[in-house]
Design a protein with these regions (language model features):
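Extended, solvent-exposed regions of the mature portions of secreted/cell-surface glycoproteins
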Residues: 170-174, 178, 207, 214
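Short strand-edge motifs at loop-to-beta-strand transitions and within beta-strands
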Residues: 181-185
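Edge beta-strands of extracellular beta-sandwich domains
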Residues: 203-223
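Compositionally biased, intrinsically disordered or flexible polar/acidic segments
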Residues: 220-258
Length: 258
């Protein structure tokens, strides 16, 4: 028996997914199950620190898939699942954040992987070490800064290695244990460009240890908490009204928040 299931996207909450499967298994214990479709849309321009269903933020798609995939992997009476879809594709009648595009893909329409693609890679590629700073989709950030205090923002890493150490501009932010193939650090942003790097130890088959690394630059626009004539002179300000998402313009790379 197969179902197209979207609990936590078109309605309900994420835990409705496993509840539905359990209910169906109770009714039909001898029937193998397949989830023939599941997925959530994401728009590279939209990011949220409080992601919720149908906001099309990159973060909600990650949250959704980080919930669904373990259920599919760990539920013994589920034979398999098909993520909808692998690639963002044209869909003439859609009128969402990206008109005429179904953006549930793990990769963009030009085949560039979204960050969440590397979550699947970390889960399934147990033959190779995977370490990916999941911020390629959010390299232009902004935040409200009080005085000169750093602005803490999350940076996620996808990995199949047991522990990750994260660095900002060469300074260690410590190590964290991996849970569900993810590690999330609160990173203090304070200037226009930061160099973020991640390192993890990988035990080779011969019991030797190699160091796996990933790195990228993140641009940051601090927005003064108290705007005045002086600090507005060199600041291009955009205001996003009515949304809990950050929005980054394709043309200007200007990032705005509520």
């Amino acid at each position: 028996v197969g179902w197209n299931l979207y609990q936590g996207w078109y309605g309900g909450d994420l835990t409705g997914f496993e509840r539905f499967l359990a209910e169906q298994h109770k009714k039909y214990p001898s029937h193998p199950m397949v989830v023939s479709e599941y997925g959530a849309g994401s728009d590279k321009r939209l990011h949220s620190l409080q992601p919720h269903a149908f906001d099309f933020s990159i973060e909600y798609q990650q949250k959704y898939l980080e919930h669904y995939l373990p259920v599919l992997e760990e539920t013994p009476y589920v034979c398999g699942g098909t993520h909808w879809n692998f690639i963002d594709f044209s869909s003439a009648l859609r009128d969402e954040s990206m008109p005429r595009i179904n953006n549930k893909g793990l990769v963009y329409s030009d085949r560039t992987p979204k960050d969440v693609y590397y979550y699947y890679k970390a889960v399934w590629r147990q033959d190779i070490p995977v370490l990916h700073i999941a911020s390629r989709d959010w390299t232009h950030r902004s935040g409200v800064q009080h005085g000169k205090a750093p602005v803490p923002l999350p940076v996620k890493v996808y990995t199949n290695l047991p522990e990750v150490e994260l660095f900002i501009d060469g300074t260690s932010l410590g190590k964290q244990k991996t849970e569900n193939y993810t590690v999330t650090f609160q990173v203090p942003f304070s200037r226009k460009e930061h160099f973020i790097s991640a390192k993890a130890e990988n035990k080779e088959a011969d019991k030797s240890i190699s160091m796996i690394e990933d790195a990228l630059h993140i641009n940051f626009t601090p927005i003064p908490a108290n705007l005045n004539e002086t600090n507005l002179r060199n600041l291009e300000l955009a205001v996003n009204v009515g949304s809990n998402c950050f929005y980054t313009s394709d043309e200007s790379r200007l990032s705005s928040e509520v």
